[in-house]
UniProtKB/Swiss-Prot annotation:
Keywords: ATP-binding, Cell cycle, Cell division, Cell shape, Cell wall biogenesis/degradation, Cytoplasm, Ligase, Magnesium, Nucleotide-binding, Peptidoglycan synthesis. A motif (Meso-diaminopimelate recognition motif) lies at residues 409-412. UDP-N-acetyl-alpha-D-muramoyl-L-alanyl-D-glutamate binds at residues 22, 24, 39-41, 152-154, 180, 186, 188. One of its GO terms (cellular component) is cytoplasm. This is UDP-N-acetylmuramoyl-L-alanyl-D-glutamate--2,6-diaminopimelate ligase. It comes from Yersinia pestis. Belongs to the MurCDEF family. MurE subfamily. Meso-2,6-diaminopimelate binds at residues 385, 409-412, 460, 464. The gene is murE. Pathway: Cell wall biogenesis; peptidoglycan biosynthesis.
Length: 490
């Protein structure tokens, strides 16, 4: 324990520490309990409980209760008080778990959309070239093929270092991590050293937390301005990305639409030609590393963008282009992200996690590229979240799909009828839309009505296998519902 707090010049008693935890419910004998002041609760209230459970020591937020950097004792248990503990947590946890991030190649990916697919592509692609790869993010954490589901995109600063330590101990040599704006603002990845950091795009999301787009952009920018990274990869097709490139002359500029800045002197990768077909896309590109052609099984223009960004990220780190291109056709779409389900004589069904106006627009545009018949859209909006996006999403569905079915998503504590009414308020002609509250019923209805050459996009839940109604968590999966209707397995 002395080594852990040596940077603060504190004289603390020597104790052997077993684990480091923020959760008093699981704190046990020999642990270091961390008492931070969070958004919802003050962890210092749980110090007595942690002591009762036999923790070896406590580190707590000093603000308002103790001198800025000080040591006290409660019932024989040393309590180290540090001011702004949240800001130091990543460093402390890194020390505690012996700097696991330095033992593997760590890539951080941020942006509103595309984080999950890009991290999965990076992990799959690097593993195909001999790495033992892991992912950390929305779908879960763990080695590829052994991913355990998670609650938050970016865990606490302690969780992240602990997880990295476990991954290194399991043999991981490469990890691709989704980095959320919440995680950046709360310093959860502050002490990590990234081999590369990636920006996908920025659009309306999490405004219930950030308040406005300026704050949201500033949160994302932290990964490129205040965090340590060897390489920076920026999507130049995004307005914010292009603006950032002017401040990042050494970054890799990536575009699928000819948006690499004129006179760009840094590394770059740009698509020349993209052909969409039933089974994915063929992409011809040019770059600082030479030209090539990429065959992909993923759907939609934004997945072309995700692929190019992932490719550039691996090229700039020295992975050989020929091997990357040979592995590309074997890359799999992410579970519940533009995931395609087919059956003879049935419509093509695409399950996607799109739950923002921008993501829904992109998902519909993507499905349209591969659609020869009518395009159907089944979606809803979550309760107790940004209400401003509901009419926007209704308008987008009406504009871009031929047939729309509005249904429930995760209503939470709100009345499902009120959420649907908000969505319908954004339509020019609500009479063109079917509203079916039961989600399984809505999905079934759309698939039964659709013809063989139609495409049915089911948006909003993606990989989720539950539905939040009131305070209940019900078993429900779009993927399982679709697979049953098409006579297959999800």
């Amino acid at each position: 324990m002395r080594d852990l707090f040596a940077p603060w010049g504190l004289d603390v008693p020597e104790r052997a520490l077993r684990e480091m935890t923020l959760d008093s419910r699981i704190a046990a004998a020999g642990d270091l309990f961390v008492a931070v002041v969070g958004h919802q609760t003050d962890g210092r209230r749980y110090i007595p409980q942690a002591i009762a459970q036999g923790v070896a020591a406590i580190v707590a937020e000093a603000d308002g209760v103790a001198p800025d950097v000080s040591v006290a004792e409660i019932h024989g248990v040393p309590v180290i008080y540090l001011r702004n503990l949240n800001q130091h947590l990543s460093t402390l946890a890194g020390q505690f778990y012996h700097q696991p991030g330095a033992a593997l190649r760590l890539v951080g990916v941020t942006g509103t959309n595309g984080k999950t697919t890009t991290t999965q592509l990076l992990a799959q692609w690097s593993q195909a070239l001999g790495e033992t790869s892991a992912v950390m993010g929305t779908v879960g954490n763990g080695l590829l093929g052994q991913v355990i589901p998670t609650e938050n995109t970016t865990g606490s600063a302690v969780d992240i270092q602990h997880l990295l330590r476990n991954l290194v101990d399991q043999g991981a040599t490469f990890a691709a991590m989704e980095v959320s704006s919440h995680g950046l603002i709360q310093d959860r990845v502050a002490a990590l050293s990234f081999a590369a950091v990636v920006f996908t795009n920025l659009s309306r999301d999490h405004l219930d937390y950030h308040g406005n787009m300026t704050s949201y952009e500033a949160a994302k920018w932290l990964l490129f301005s205040t965090h340590q990274s060897e390489h920076k990869i920026i999507n130049a097709d995004d307005d914010v990305g292009r603006r950032w490139l002017s401040q990042l002359p050494q970054a890799v500029a990536v575009s699928m639409a000819g948006n690499v800045p004129k006179g760009w002197n840094g590394p770059w990768l740009s698509a020349n030609k993209v052909i969409y077909h039933d089974n994915g896309a063929s992409i011809a590109f040019d770059s600082s590393w030479g030209e090539g052609e990429l065959e992909s099984r993923l759907m939609g223009a934004f997945n072309v963008s995700n692929l190019l960004v992932a490719l550039a990220t691996l090229l700039v780190q020295g992975y050989p282009m020929a091997q990357l291109l040979a592995a590309a056709p074997h890359l799999q779409p992410v579970c519940g992200r533009m995931e395609v389900f087919n059956a003879p004589g049935k419509p093509t069904v695409v399950v996607d996690y799109a739950h923002t106006p921008d993501a829904l627009e992109k998902a519909l545009a993507a499905a349209r590229l591969h659609c020869t018949g009518k395009l159907w859209c089944v979606f809803g909006c979550g309760g107790d979240r940004d209400k401003g996006k509901r009419p926007l999403m209704g308008g987008i569905a009406e504009q871009l799909a031929d047939c729309v079915v509005v249904t429930d998503d995760n209503p939470r504590s709100e009345e499902p009828q009120a959420i649907v009414a908000d969505i319908l308020s954004g339509l020019l002609d609500a009479g063109r839309v079917q509203a079916i509250h039961g989600r399984a019923e809505a999905v079934t209805s759309a698939i039964m009505q659709a013809k063989e050459d139609d495409v049915v996009l089911i948006a909003g839940k993606g990989h989720e296998d539950y539905q939040l109604v009131g305070n209940r968590r019900l078993d429900y999966s779009d993927r399982v519902t679709v697979a049953r209707l098409l006579g297959g397995q999800a």
